[in-house]
Structure formats: structure tokens, C-alpha cells
Amino acid sequence: MYKDLEGKVVVITGSSTGLGKSMAIRFATEKAKVVVNYRSKEDEANSVLEEEIKKVGGEAIAVKGDVTVESDVINLVQSAIKEFGKLDVMINNAGMENPVSSHEMSLSDWNKVIDTNLTGAFLGSREAIKYFVENDIKGTVINMSSVHEWKIPWPLFVHYAASKGGMKLMTETLALEYAPKGIRVNNIGPGAINTPINAEKFADPEQRADVESMIPMGYIGEPEEIAAVAWLASSEASYVTGITLFADGGMTQYPSFQAGRG
């Protein structure tokens, strides 16, 4: 438990399911006040509030919004401030992937992934940092990146890799720019995790075994293991900024990836 998170206001994009949901529950357990963001499925967001967060005694609201729409992101941050009086932590978690051969990829395919993963994270970071600067708050921004930001290129995922590679330098640049104001900006780089976005792939025994063979710890992670992102938001990480914290079971240390697996 991180006692200093009690009473903090945390916005998590894309938090009605998957990693975002687990993070919302974890922060609620830490007694933070949580803004659960969803794009279209209000029932999933309400389920997180009613069946998960209230169960641990947490306080939260659900706010609809598409991270690719600037006005929606502005509203998301303003809703947190209006409801809870402030903002302390912004977690840009919303993301997507859509495997397509590079030579067959349409501009629409490309833009959809870039707009969600990279532009959405920029908009969330910008709005949070704007509030922090204007109110002299030493806030925290955490972006949900991937092992693909660094040294794991992957066929059919050129748009995804570009979005996460861009996120790495975006995060490092923001961290450098706002460190003098005490604002911290970091990435989390998950490896293979059991989430809805991976459900179809991991349901295939052969594909699952292939992925597990590339993880030194030997198993696919659970969303709760990424929810340790709470540490990065706490005062225990007060001297940490501009990094990517990989939570991947050692996947980035796999010998073939060290050589640049394609």
C-alpha cells in the first residue's frame, strides 16, 4: 500500500476493461479517487464502478470519451477537476492494435492506431500538464507503452511499433521539459498480458505456447501484475522520471530480441 495515494485524483483512459480496469481497481484500493474512462460501452464502465471499485470502498466516476477527439480529452480532465476538485495523476492507457501487412495497410489503418496510441496519449499528457503548470502541482503522467517501443519489431504491426516508439521519445521529451517544475512523466512497457485485446491470440494453444517460449519467466502476465503502476504514481518514485518500466517477464531480455527479432 502507498499511503500517499489516498485522496489523490487519478484519470485513467480506456479503463473499463483490460489493463485500465485493473489499474482503476488498484488505485481505488489505495484509496485514490478514480475517473474511469470508456469510449462506447457504458455498461462495462458502470460494472467497474459498481462491482469492483465500490467493493473495495473506493470512490470513482465514469466519463465517456474518445481519446482521438481533442474535446473529449479536455472534457475528461475537466470532469475530474469538477467532480473531485483537482487532478494528481494522468494515466494514458487507451490503445489499440490491428495487425495488417505493411504493403496492404491503408492510411486509415495507420491513422487509427497512431491517433489512438500516440496522439491520444499526447492530448492526455498535454491537458494534465497544462493543469499542473497552471496550478503549481507536482503531478504525474504515466503512459502505457509496450515492449515494442524499443527492440522488438514485429511483422504486421508497423503502425503499432511506430506509435509506441514515438511514445518513448514523447515521454522522455516531456519528462525533460517539465522536470524543473516537479512534474514526472514515465512509461510502463507491458509484455504479453492476458487482456481482451490478446484474447483471440492466446486462446490458440499453438500461438500461446509460441509467445510463452519467448518469455524467460515462462508465463503470460495478468493485468493485476501491471497494476503495480501505482508505485510510479507514489512518492516512493519521486525521483523517477523519463523512464520506461518494463513489466514483461524478461521478454525484452530474450536473446533473439536482443539481436532485433523481426
From Swiss-Prot:
Keyword Oxidoreductase assigned: yes
CDD domains, sorted: GlcDH_SDR_c (cd05358)
PROSITE patterns, alphabetized: ADH_SHORT (PS00061)
EC number: 1.1.1.47
GO BP term, pick one: sporulation resulting in formation of a cellular spore
Sorted UniProt keywords: NADP, Oxidoreductase, Sporulation
Catalytic activity: D-glucose + NAD(+) = D-glucono-1,5-lactone + NADH + H(+); D-glucose + NADP(+) = D-glucono-1,5-lactone + NADPH + H(+)
Active site: Y160
Pfam families tied to this protein: adh_short_C2
Domain of life, per lineage: Bacteria
Residues forming coiled coils: none
Residues annotated for substrate binding in this entry: S146
InterPro entries: NAD(P)-bd_dom_sf (IPR036291), Sc_DH/Rdtase_CS (IPR020904), SDR_fam (IPR002347)
GO molecular function annotations of the record: glucose 1-dehydrogenase (NAD+) activity; glucose 1-dehydrogenase (NADP+) activity
Top-tier EC class: oxidoreductase
Keyword Lyase carried by entry: no
Binding positions for NADP(+) per the UniProt entry: 11-35
Family label: Belongs to the short-chain dehydrogenases/reductases (SDR) family.
Subunit and interaction comment: Homotetramer.
Protein name (database record): Glucose 1-dehydrogenase B
Species this chain originates from: Priestia megaterium (Bacillus megaterium)
Lineage: Bacteria, Bacillati, Bacillota, Bacilli, Bacillales
Gene: gdhB
